[in-house]
């Protein structure tokens, strides 16, 4: 086990720093708040191996999936952002803001991810799709968190995510700072 101490601040910064330290074929984003089921990891790994898939995104909105942590505001926001992601970027995933993700490490590093905040949630799949990588969703069951508090401000972070999506749509280099 390697323990990393985050150098800068921000959700996206922590994830990017972690991905950049991974030396295995695949990486996985797995929250420490107890809301993810580790039993779903094998399913995600099998999808990567069996389907020539590059990234598997856990989804709380597929048949056989659920969320015990969503509020009506986060549900509506996520559905809206997932719709935007699928309509404008043809992502083909059903839960864009849920960062239970497993994917090809080198391909993730090649994306040159920049988002230091929650915009990371949309930057990863959008840049992956723009690079021609294959994305799929896998049913996931989100449990109530056992530790920690949500740091997401639905409206402030939602606006920031929307701005990030607009930048990713209009700017070819997709630079997000």
Task: Identify the residue ranges that each predicted region occupies.
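Acidic donor-binding segment of Leloir-type glycosyltransferases
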Residues: 1-4
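Acceptor/aglycone-binding surface of glycosyltransferases and processive sugar-polymer synthases
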Residues: 7-21, 26-29, 38-118, 144-162, ...
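Short beta-strand segments
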Residues: 30-31, 139
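Acidic metal-phosphate-binding loop of nucleotide-sugar-dependent transferases
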Residues: 34-36
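Short, hydrophobic secondary-structure boundary micro-motifs
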Residues: 56, 95-97, 137, 174-177
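Catalytic donor-sugar/metal-binding loop of nucleotide-sugar-dependent glycosyltransferases
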Residues: 92, 116, 125-143
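DNA-recognition element of transcription regulators
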Residues: 122
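C-terminal, non-catalytic tails of nucleotide-sugar-dependent glycosyltransferases
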Residues: 163-177
């Amino acid at each position: 086990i390697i323990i990393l101490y985050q150098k800068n601040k921000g959700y996206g910064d922590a994830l990017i720093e972690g991905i950049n330290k991974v030396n295995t074929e695949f990486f996985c984003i797995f929250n420490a708040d107890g809301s993810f089921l580790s039993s779903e990891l094998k399913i995600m790994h099998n999808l990567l191996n069996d389907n020539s898939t590059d990234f598997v995104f856990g989804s709380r909105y597929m048949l056989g999936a659920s969320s015990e942590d969503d509020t009506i505001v986060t549900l509506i926001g996520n559905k809206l952002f997932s719709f935007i992601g699928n309509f404008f970027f043809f992502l083909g995933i059903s839960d864009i803001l849920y960062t239970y993700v497993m994917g090809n490490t080198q391909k993730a590093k090649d994306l040159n991810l920049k988002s230091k905040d929650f915009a990371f949630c949309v930057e990863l799949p959008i840049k992956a799709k723009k690079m021609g990588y294959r994305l799929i969703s896998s049913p996931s069951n989100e449990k109530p968190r056992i530790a920690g508090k949500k740091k997401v401000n639905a409206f402030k972070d939602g606006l920031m995510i929307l701005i990030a999506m607009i930048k990713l749509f209009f700017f070819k280099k997709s630079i997000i700072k």
